Amino acid sequence: MNQATQIIPFTTSGSLVDYVDRKVIVVLRDGKKLIGILRSFDQFANLMLQYTIERIYVDDMYGDIDRGVYIVRGENVVLLGELDLDKEYDAVKQLRRMPAEELYPLAKLHEEEKKKNIREKGKYLHSVGFSVDGGHDDLY
């Protein structure tokens, strides 16, 4: 194998093999953040996570919802990365843990405010001659 072929990055779903049996974070198109152990995947990057939690962040607070075994359709994945357990602990200890039931309404409120701001910004940009793209679920 020559050096040129070694430089080309491996970007297909096969590159996920290094993450199997490791703790990963998955960010979905709708903004959900899932943390769990990647157990399996297929050629379409459909994922199976075990011991999954859905983590909700609001300001300096976070809450976890246990989801157990979770199957994610590959087209909904925006980001997938391995978690460094030490760094995760250091990052989370700076936040206040709250019950997810209390945070969920706050998260919905923040999401609605964000959508409203995006709509207002889009209207303004359109009024000064810019083209505004994006659909109702185009969050990335």
UniProtKB/Swiss-Prot annotation:
CDD domains: LSm1. Its main location: nucleus. Residues 11-86 form the Sm domain. GO terms for molecular function: mRNA 3'-UTR AU-rich region binding; mRNA binding; poly(U) RNA binding; RNA stem-loop binding. Keywords: Cytoplasm, mRNA processing, mRNA splicing, Nucleus, Ribonucleoprotein, RNA-binding. Pfam families: LSM. It is found in: Nucleus; Cytoplasm; Cytoplasm, P-body. GO terms for biological process: deadenylation-dependent decapping of nuclear-transcribed mRNA; mRNA processing; RNA splicing. Residues 129-140 are annotated as: Confers RNA-binding specificity. GO terms for cellular component: cytoplasm; cytosol; Lsm1-7-Pat1 complex; nucleus; P-body; ribonucleoprotein complex. Transmembrane segments: none annotated. The keyword Nucleus applies. PROSITE patterns: SM. Component of the heptameric LSM1-LSM7 complex that forms a seven-membered ring structure with a donut shape. The LSm subunits are arranged in the order lsm1, lsm2, lsm3, lsm6, lsm5, lsm7 and lsm4. Component of the cytoplasmic LSM1-LSM7 complex which is involved in mRNA degradation by activating the decapping step. The LSM1-LSM7 complex loads onto the 3'-end of single stranded RNA. Belongs to the snRNP Sm proteins family. PANTHER family: LSM1 (PTHR15588), U6 SNRNA-ASSOCIATED SM-LIKE PROTEIN LSM1 (PTHR15588:SF8). This is LSM1-LSM7 complex subunit lsm1. It comes from Schizosaccharomyces pombe (strain 972 / ATCC 24843) (Fission yeast).
